[in-house]
Amino acid sequence: MSQKIYFKITNDKECHNGFQYKDGLNILQEKFNDNLEDSCVPGRLYFTKPKHILKYLDYGIYLREIYLPTDNPDFKMIRDPTGDKYGANMIILGERRDLRNPDTWKYMVSKGVDIRAEDDYAVKWASKNGHLKVVEYLVSLGADIKSDGDYAVRWASENGHIDVVKYLVSQNADIRADNDYAVKWASSNGHLEVVKYLVSQGANIREQNDYAIRLASQYGHLEVVKYLISLGADIRADNDCAVRLASENGHIEIVNYLISQGADIRAKK
C-alpha cells in the first residue's frame, strides 16, 4: 500500500454514482474506464490531492483519507483530464472526519490544505451551510469573509443561518452587497428572523424595485410579506407583480392579504 495520502469527500450515506463506499479496500465492480479523454465518468473511483480538495466541498460532509493499493497487481489508476483529480479501480478508505467539525479543518491544514484556495470557498461553504465554529476557525486563519462580493453573508442569509450572519456582521461583512442580495434572498426563502436582523443593520427592503416583497409573495412566505409591508414595502411595485406571482403559485392567503392592502388583481404585466 502506498503511504502517500489523498482525499475524497463523501456524503452522509457514502454512496456516490451507485457505488457504496466502505472502510478499507473498495474495488470497482464494473469495467475500469481508462480513456484518457474522459472526465467525471462512471467506471472510476475518484480522489484528489489535498491541495485540490476544496474544489469538492459540495460533494458531502465527510473527509476521507485515501490510500492506494499499489502492491496489488490488478491496481489501475488514471489522471483525469481536468488535472485536479484521479480515478482508480480500487482505493483504500482510511479515517473519516466530519467537515462540520473545526478539528477536521485543523487536520486539513496540517496536510497542506490552503483554506483560502478557490477564492476563499471554504468560508463561503461553511457560511452557506451554517457551520459557525468552522467559519470562526477559518476566519482565525485569515479567511476573507468579504471575498466574491461578501458572498459568505449573502449565502448565510439566503439559507437562514442567523448565528453565522450575526458573526459575519461582527467581522464587518457588508449586508448590502450586490444590491441588498442578503435581505432579498432571506425574504425569498422565508427566513423572517434573518430579514428582521438585516433590516436592523440597515438593509434596504425596497432595493431593486421592492424585489424582496415580490420574492416573498412568489414563494408563499406570508409572515415575511406582512413584515415587509409594515416597513413600507410597495406591494404594487412593477405593476402589482407581488399579487400576480402569489396568484401564479397558488398562495391564496398571500393573495387575499395583498388585496386587503390595496393590490390590484387586474393589473397587467
Swiss-Prot record:
Stretches forming ANK repeats? 118-147, 148-177, 179-207, 208-237, 238-267
Q: Which InterPro entries match?
A: Ankyrin_rpt, Ankyrin_rpt-contain_sf
**Sorted UniProt keywords:** ANK repeat, Repeat
Indicate yes or no for the key word Ion transport: no
Superkingdom, taxonomy of origin: Viruses
Q: Which PANTHER family match?
A: ANKYRIN REPEAT PROTEIN, GH09064P
Q: What is this protein called?
A: Putative ankyrin repeat protein L23
Q: From what organism does this protein derive?
A: Acanthamoeba polyphaga mimivirus
